[in-house]
UniProtKB/Swiss-Prot annotation:
Protein species of origin: Desulfitobacterium hafniense (strain Y51)
Keywords, alphabetical: Methyltransferase, One-carbon metabolism, Transferase
Enzyme class (EC, first level): transferase
Biological processes, Gene Ontology terms: methanogenesis; methylation; one-carbon metabolic process
Record gene name: mtgB
Domain of life: Bacteria
Lineage: Bacteria, Bacillati, Bacillota, Clostridia, Eubacteriales
Further remark: In contrast to a small clade of this large protein family whose members have trimethylamine:corrinoid methyltransferase activity and have a genetically encoded pyrrolysine residue essential for catalysis, MtgB lacks pyrrolysine and uses a quaternary amine as substrate.
Main function: Methyltransferase able to methylate free cob(I)alamin in vitro, using glycine betaine as the methyl donor, yealding methylcobalamin (methylCbl) and dimethylglycine. In vivo, probably carries out the methylation of a corrinoid protein, likely the adjacently encoded DSY3155, with glycine betaine, to then supply methyl groups to tetrahydrofolate (THF) for ultimate conversion to carbon dioxide; oxidation of the methyl group would also provide reducing equivalents for anaerobic respiration.
Record-given protein name: Glycine betaine methyltransferase
Catalyzed reaction equations: Co(I)-[glycine betaine-specific corrinoid protein] + glycine betaine + H(+) = methyl-Co(III)-[glycine betaine-specific corrinoid protein] + N,N-dimethylglycine
GO molecular function terms attached to this record: methyltransferase activity
Family: Belongs to the trimethylamine methyltransferase family.
Length: 479
């Protein structure tokens, strides 16, 4: 959706320039290691200094590559009504990503299954606030690793007609994702002209990219598909114990990845990604439910605008191990930071617990409510004739009320947010059952799944997808 409220810039122009200059110095004097010979060959071809696996990128090279990256692009869904524009004034929400565990209502934790993935794909498909339906929402531990990405992709396609993410687990799995997308949309030539996949490419901080991520990045760039180039620097452990230094380190890694993508295929849709946070000095754990993480979210959105590319950051981020007040207030802080500062692509919007390690059905429903509230908040005020409401104010006059006015019946659904989870009833009504938020969320996700009907998928395309997945299973020895 388009964002109507003005974006908040947390950094001054001078501070942005200081980060940029520090970043250029890192890239030129320290360099980045790329553990993948095809990537090193690209940089050699581009005239950049390569010593072993370390690449030194000049300011002129990086700045020229940024110019070829689109400021915004459309990601296409199999249902065109669900296409999303990434960049500009738009904000796109999608569920959590990469979690190997599920937290149950009773607080217990278990490994994720393919059924969990399918359930989250359906919940995302049913949500009016989630714009994408899947990536690696809940990585199924009951599926062999070699075919896990295939089953997740198929589940995303089968259970929703929204946009979805491709696998970033190396060159072959990225190519599998492209092949599946080509089957779904009618050929590789078709999807090269209109991107249908977005994938998450993470640096290996500090100042490295590994073979797995580089292989995926290059495969997607060659196919014309979108890539999020992301860095997760943990201030105090994988990054310096200063926020500006950590931001500079993150910026260097992201710009290096963007430069590679643009060198392979100029115009490749890229998204500037950040999940940088800190390492808690007491436990050593990653802390994403922290004010420092919210600061990185805010600054990353501003840096992306400075470089003229879309941004990815934020989400319902928290460090809690259960669906409690901590999960709520930390998630609201990081989601609000993303909204107010103009982040375009918000991964991990719904369901995440324990610093990316787990998903929760109840948390998904609670985060979906937060997302709905924030989308409404970002619409701001309406200033047309109905919005100004002079006529009805004049009609009611001093001491009257507006409940029975036609203006109220006409405008309240447009102007007011109606919650799907929050309880606004009178105390006596609430006291009959005294349900806590997570108990209401538990009932709601079960109701959604019971009533959800996945959108139809063309039987011929479905058969081709299943045949490809079966063939790939044989080839990797995991039928």
């Amino acid at each position: 959706m388009g964002q109507l409220l003005p974006k908040y810039n947390i950094l001054t122009e001078d501070q942005v320039q200081k980060i940029h200059e520090n970043t250029m110095k890192i890239l030129e004097e320290i360099g980045i290691e790329f553990e993948y010979e095809p990537a090193l060959e690209v940089f050699r071809r581009e005239g950049q200094k390569v010593e072993g696996k370390r690449v030194y990128l000049t300011r002129e090279f990086v700045e020229s590559k940024l110019k070829s990256a689109p400021a915004e692009f459309t990601l296409h869904a199999r249902n065109p009504e669900n296409n999303v524009v990434i960049g500009g004034d738009n904000i796109v929400f999608m569920p959590g990503y990469g979690a190997p565990f599920i937290y149950e209502l009773d607080g217990s934790r278990r490994k994720t299954t393919l059924q969990d993935y399918e359930n989250f794909a359906k919940l995302a498909g049913a949500s009016k606030n989630m714009h994408l339906s899947g990536g690696t929402m809940a990585e199924p531990q009951d599926i062999p690793d070699g075919v896990r990405h295939l089953q997740m992709l198929y589940s995303s396609i089968k259970n929703s007609d929204k946009c979805f993410m491709g696998s970033a687990e190396g060159k072959e799995r990225a190519e599998d994702s492209v092949e599946i997308a080509a089957i779904l949309f009618g050929g590789k030539d078709v999807i090269k002209e209109k991107p249908v996949l977005v994938s998450l490419i993470n640096s290996l901080t500090p100042l490295k990219y590994d073979e797995r991520m580089l292989g995926a990045l290059m495969a997607y760039a060659e196919a014309g598909q979108a890539v999020i180039i992301a860095s997760l620097v943990m201030a105090g452990s994988t990054g310096p114990a200063s926020l500006a230094g950590t931001l500079s380190l993150q910026n260097a890694e992201v710009l290096a990845g963007i430069s590679l993508a643009q060198s392979i295929n100029p115009g490749t849709p890229v998204i500037y990604g950040s999940t940088s946070a800190l390492s808690d000095m007491r436990s050593g754990s990653l802390s994403i439910g922290s004010p420092e993480c919210a600061l990185f979210i805010s600054a990353s959105a501003q840096l992306a605008r400075f470089y003229g590319v879309p941004s990815r950051s934020g989400g319902g981020l928290n460090d809690s191990k259960t669906v409690d007040a901590q999960a709520g207030y930390e998630s609201m802080m990081t989601l609000m930071a993303a909204n107010l500062t103009g982040v375009n692509f918000v991964l991990h919007t719904a369901g995440i617990l324990q610093y990316f390690m787990a998903m929760s059905y109840e948390k998904f429903i609670m985060d979906d409510e937060i997302a709905g509230m924030l989308l409404h908040y970002m619409k701001g005020y309406t200033f047309d004739e109905d919005g100004m409401a002079f006529d009805v104010i004049e009609k009611v006059g001093p001491g009257g009320h507006f409940l029975t006015q036609k203006h109220t019946r006409k405008n309240h659904k447009r102007e007011f947010y109606t919650p799907t989870l929050s309880d606004r009833s009178a105390y006596d009504t609430w006291a009959k059952e005294k349900l806590e938020t997570k108990q209401r969320a538990h009932a709601r996700w079960q109701q959604i799944l019971a009533n959800y009907v996945p959108p139809a998928l063309d039987p011929e395309i479905d058969a081709k997808l299943q045949a490809f997945i079966a063939q790939r299973g044989k080839e990797v020895g995991e039928e």
